Amino acid sequence: MDVIKKKHWWQSDALKWSVLGLLGLLVGYLVVLMYAQGEYLFAITTLILSSAGLYIFANRKAYAWRYVYPGMAGMGLFVLFPLVCTIAIAFTNYSSTNQLTFERAQEVLLDRSWQAGKTYNFGLYPAGDEWQLALSDGETGKNYLSDAFKFGGEQKLQLKETTAQPEGERANLRVITQNRQALSDITAILPDGNKVMMSSLRQFSGTQPLYTLDGDGTLTNNQSGVKYRPNNQIGFYQSITADGNWGDEKLSPGYTVTTGWKNFTRVFTDEGIQKPFLAIFVWTVVFSLITVFLTVAVGMVLACLVQWEALRGKAVYRVLLILPYAVPSFISILIFKGLFNQSFGEINMMLSALFGVKPAWFSDPTTARTMLIIVNTWLGYPYMMILCMGLLKAIPDDLYEASAMDGAGLFQNFFKITLPLLIKPLTPLMIASFAFNFNNFVLIQLLTNGGPDRLGTTTPAGYTDLLVNYTYRIAFEGGGGQDFGLAAAIATLIFLLVGALAIVNLKATRMKFD
């Protein structure tokens, strides 16, 4: 007799389809909101990932994909999506001055106004639960008063000329400041038909739009008469001369346009960018190679020492040597920054007492780079030591016994047996370490902040900057504005360089991907 298993309420198909339906509606609502806000890339990504997830968890035939989907969705969202966005930005002029769309930039310019008429002093007087607006003309001495009104939204107030003083006490500056936004939405209409709006905390003035949009898309400055035309090569409204050529004046804010390969060509053709870029690239490669070599060398030697059978107290030494790995790196970096202080650091005090020298760790390029390598070796050797300690356990003791019978010494054992057997399994990890140090942003940012700075460069660059720090400084610390497009182009080049170097390393060591 077959036993029919009773399903719990949370296992019912009705509940499953109800939850999936609600999630589908929520996702659809979010996608529509993103699309309405102009965030097309986010909307498409959300739609693809959510639709795939709903299909996989609703379809029994796709049951096996339920174990793979979270990882693939995470990789797509946190790896591929930022990569695609970065590459897309690299082909635009996106920067602190060119962030808006053309339509939004045009709207901002058309919203600007200029003072084109008389200025009137104004006062705000209570009228029960409402207010009255009073204007006075300082030239003619005429006074104008509105009917009672309440704050809220855009409104037009018809003012009448009066000789009587409004009742009640005039509102102080605090009340006006609190209601400044509401007062800015008020248009006061004088008896002669002129319109005035709030221009300061105590004045209403006649205002007119600063720019007028012509039928051919040209903006005309109503104050100066200068005409501006959108220049899609640079992403700005730019003035035009009488003969139709481009003038020197540009209107901010600008708008985002596609510039093609311009940002990439700037890296290789602009000497102010090319020279620091190439120098920083060479230093980044050298820094990564030296760091990998020293961390592996120090870690391997220390692993061999703490695995030495004749050594007493090996457990204590292991714990002490692994401590730098247990302490968060940013804490160690800041501690070293204090130790290397040129005036009061303990390292310079010790060197001065012993040898009479005080290296300029933060102002001299060579010593600053040396300091970085020392600190990074300190931070990285425990990881390599732990790996080597585990790999040493896999080396058979018979090999060392056979070499001892042949009369091999300590160094021969290390270079002929230990090193060859360790270096092969360590190679993939060394490549990963190289890629990590190639983009070791935190070390540079916390210890030297890229300094000392290079002189004569178009973009901010330092002697200890890695490519990733150089990109960050261009994007967020540029003196001439934040150039996200150029930074994205350099980030794309970094991605290609790291990928190419990793492939070259794998090919050189003849490592098989499987």
Swiss-Prot record:
Keywords: Cell inner membrane, Cell membrane, Membrane, Sugar transport, Transmembrane, Transmembrane helix, Transport. It holds the Pfam family MalF_P2. Residues 35-37, 92-276, 341-371, 438-483 are periplasmic. One of its GO terms (cellular component) is maltose transport complex. GO terms for biological process: maltodextrin transmembrane transport. It is a multi-pass membrane protein. It comes from the Bacteria. The keyword Transmembrane applies. Residues 281-505 form the ABC transmembrane type-1 domain. Residues 1-13, 59-70, 298-319, 393-416, 505-514 are cytoplasmic. The chain crosses the membrane at residues 14-34, 38-58, 71-91, 277-297, 320-340, 372-392, 417-437, 484-504. The keyword Transmembrane helix applies. GO terms for molecular function: ABC-type maltose transporter activity. It is found in: Cell inner membrane. Gene3D superfamilies: D-maltodextrin-binding protein, MBP, MalF N-terminal region-like, MetI-like. Its main location: membrane. The complex is composed of two ATP-binding proteins (MalK), two transmembrane proteins (MalG and MalF) and a solute-binding protein (MalE). Part of the ABC transporter complex MalEFGK involved in maltose/maltodextrin import. Probably responsible for the translocation of the substrate across the membrane. Belongs to the binding-protein-dependent transport system permease family. MalFG subfamily. This is Maltose/maltodextrin transport system permease protein MalF.
